Regions:
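Phosphate/oxyanion-binding active-site loops and adjacent basic polyanion-contact surfaces
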Residues: 46-48, 78, 116-120
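Short strand->helix junction
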Residues: 74-76
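Conserved alpha/beta-hydrolase
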Residues: 78, 86-110
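N-terminal cap/lid segment of alpha/beta-hydrolase-fold proteins
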Residues: 21-59
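Catalytic nucleophile-loop/oxyanion-hole region of alpha/beta-hydrolase
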Residues: 88, 104-133
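Short beta-strand element of the alpha/beta-hydrolase
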Residues: 63-72
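N-terminal presequences and immediately downstream first alpha-helices
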Residues: 1-28
């Protein structure tokens, strides 16, 4: 798969600072997602599961791409900034997976322990699962 070189990202003048972008992104409203999705549970090696919503693009790119979106600290996969990103990527032909960290969102109750967004191995397991399926 040939990738294009990344284009520089220039934030708008009214949101130059990363912290301000975070605050604005979480406060800016977004309508509910009405796109169809498939619910997926990814089993983890320790017996826990991550719950994922898979949004297939109606007009996928010639070489399919899956974008995996992980929510921020204390959030879930139905936050406004996630909904906006799903819509934008889906319109551009990208399949999107929104992943809830252990015990968050629709995955609440699946983790044996308490909420933990810092389990880096979980990201690797999601990427490995996406490659296999």
């Amino acid at each position: 798969m040939k990738l294009s070189p990344p284009r520089p990202c220039r934030p708008p003048y009214w949101a130059l600072h990363g912290h301000l972008q975070t605050v604005i992104g979480s406060l800016w409203p977004a309508p509910p997602l009405t796109l169809p999705f498939t619910r997926l549970e990814i089993p983890l090696v320790d017996g826990d599961r991550l719950v994922v919503r898979c949004f297939a693009s109606a007009h996928p790119l010639p070489q399919p791409i899956i974008a995996c979106l992980f929510h921020g600290l204390g959030g879930h996969d139905d936050r406004p900034y996630i909904r906006r990103t799903v819509r934008l990527l889906n319109q551009r032909g990208v399949h999107v997976w929104t992943i809830n960290h252990r015990g968050c969102g629709i995955g609440r109750g699946f983790a044996k322990g308490t909420y933990h967004s810092g389990v880096a191995a979980d990201l690797g397991e999601v990427f490995a699962y996406a490659r296999q399926h």
